[in-house]
Regions:
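Catalytic centers of hydrolytic enzymes
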Residues: 1-240
Length: 240
């Protein structure tokens, strides 16, 4: 029965949805990808959030252009996490982005694919994230690598509250070291409303009319990587 379910076609995509960069190497843990954008959009739109985060380590497989099966979606999100909506401050969002980009240009499962916001990582600034012996966030002890954080086209206000959609692993359990979140530090507005792969299916079927189209052909320029040598969006820098 499960085999039949996995083969069931749930939607279509006109573009290949990928975890890889232009060079064919895995990128979702260190750069924006079109599948990362899609997964983050699904959380933000379905939960009605200002911002959504998806950890790159939770985006596990590509989807080739053509039919999308239930199995394809499960392969993308195989962990069975559940969608949550929480209230956080701009400072918590900024600290999360800083933790997510701490390992860059190296990979991190906690690298954040985002929706509803854009930001720049300045790779020339060394990370000053302090972690405890469990690799959990403690504080930022120096200059931030992340800047130009815009939410819905407006500069992030560290003192303002925003609604943030993601899964229980990050928002409630403070997974991947995201101790600025966790049940002690966030106000839960919607608690484990839907399993992660269903979030993705529902977004494509209900909000995109069952077809992932050209708007997801390439990364949408949400994350810009800045170095002394370049000042281009991540999807462009892959080609240099």
């Amino acid at each position: 029965k499960f085999d039949a379910l996995q083969k069931k076609v749930v939607a279509k995509t006109t573009v290949t949805l990928t975890t890889k960069g232009a060079d064919g190497k895995r990128a979702v843990r260190s750069a924006e990808t079109n599948l990362g954008d899609l997964c983050a959009d699904a959380y933000r739109v379905l939960l009605g959030a200002d911002v959504a985060f998806v950890n790159g380590g939770g985006v596990r497989a590509d989807i080739n252009a053509g039919d999308i099966t239930y199995g394809d979606i499960i392969n993308v999100h195989p962990f069975g996490n559940s969608a949550c909506l929480v209230e956080v401050t701009g400072q918590q969002i900024k600290d999360a982005l800083e933790l997510g980009s701490a390992a860059y240009p190296g990979e991190s499962g906690g690298f954040l694919q985002v929706s509803g916001l854009t930001y720049t990582i300045n790779a020339d600034i060394p990370s000053s994230v302090v972690k405890n012996d469990k690799s959990e966030f403690v504080k930022v002890d120096g200059a931030y690598r992340v800047s130009d954080i815009m939410v819905g086209g407006q500069p992030l206000d560290v003192n303002k509250t925003y609604t943030l959609a993601s899964h229980n692993y990050m928002l409630k359990d403070a997974g991947d070291g995201y101790t600025m979140f966790g049940t002690k530090n966030v106000k839960v507005l919607q608690d484990e409303v839907m399993i992660d792969n269903q979030v993705l299916i529902n977004y494509i079927v209900e909000k995109l009319g069952g077809v992932v189209g050209a708007e997801y052909a390439a990364p949408q320029g949400r994350i810009t990587i800045k170095t002394a040598a370049s000042d281009v969006p991540t999807n462009e820098s892959d080609k240099v």
